[in-house]
Amino acid sequence: MSLLNNRSFRATVLGHLVVDLLNAERPLILAVLSVPLGLSNTLIGLVSLLHTISGSLLQPVFGWMADRIGPRRLVAGGILWMAATFGLAVISPGYLALVLLIVGGIGSAAFHPAGAMEATRSARSHLEQQETTAASLFFLLGQIGFILAPAIGGPLLERWGTPGLLALLPLALPVGLLAGRDLSSLPGAQPLEPATPTPHPGRRVLTFAFLAFVLVTAIQSWAQTNMVTYLPKYYSDLGYRPGVYGLLAATFMVGTAVGGMTGGWLGDRISRRSIVSLSLLAAGVPLALYPALGATAWGYPLAFVSGGLTGACYSILIVHGQRLLPGRAGASSGLILGFTFAAGSLGTLVSGVQADRFGFDAVFVTTAGLCVLGGLLALATRIE
């Protein structure tokens, strides 16, 4: 049976599209509000951090719940919560809008571990154990949401301001109801194939390999979240209109989607560790070129290539993280996704301080260096 013909999987990936469509409007909203509210880059990073923490700290809890009650209520409830808080945020005045954007992260926290659990569970049933491919399809729809968000949201913001984003809400309600109808209510606690062990490894080797994996995951998330959060602000500071920097942000997310799908497909066929290492090493090149070429016509290909290379290893890292905790699909999904979201936002806060003090060129160079470091560290992991 084709995975895409599975009603539960279809509802899950459509839900991911809607959740990340709303999530990805946040950087555009913050860029628009930065002038009337006087938001610094540090404060923008702090809002993004608080939004992520409000969700990431809860993801293991929601994952634990998914293992016991199934994904249906968590996925559907997460979508509808996101829609409600987003709708209130775009019509609320002043700092209340920021508070509502932060609280909306709870809906994302409920959705992501349950959705990722359902995606990989569907792969074990319908895609001959190709979990990385299934995870990449799940994350592909999320990336499509990130692509559509600036492409649609930029013109809406330019024409009607933040209230114009209410036009996105009619997409969320039917998808939330569809998830409530079609998703499984079966508990998610079940054995997962563990990460491939190495015969008789020393404790020190295992500890270093695990720490290397943690650092690689944090670096990948930091690099990608930096670009998602600050690319609109970078071009806004250069004087570009919302419609233009929305298109540039969408170009980055198109690259991320293409890279993520390609990396996931390759991850079921060749060495996953090599994909992670090579993609991050290569990502340092376009990121390092941003200070010289970002404000030219080369900004579009740089956005696409940097998105593709930073996103190529994402589903591989998530699936490997799930396998480190076999037996609890929901809890393991919540832990690894919560960690990636939190690590990315903490890094983004640091980069916001750096941008305020030294400018965005310094942020791009630092992000490039982090990717190179992550690519080298990946060689020490046991991702296979």
Where are these regions (language model features)?
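Helix-loop-helix hairpin linking two adjacent transmembrane segments in secondary transporters
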Residues: 94, 137-184
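Structural signature of the two symmetry-related core transmembrane helices
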Residues: 73-87, 274-289, 368
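C-terminal transmembrane helical hairpin of 12-TM major facilitator-type secondary transporters
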Residues: 270-317
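Extracytoplasmic gate region of multi-pass secondary transporters
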Residues: 26-27, 208-250, 257
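Conserved MFS/SLC helix-loop-helix module at the cytosolic interface between two early adjacent transmembrane helices
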Residues: 57-94, 270
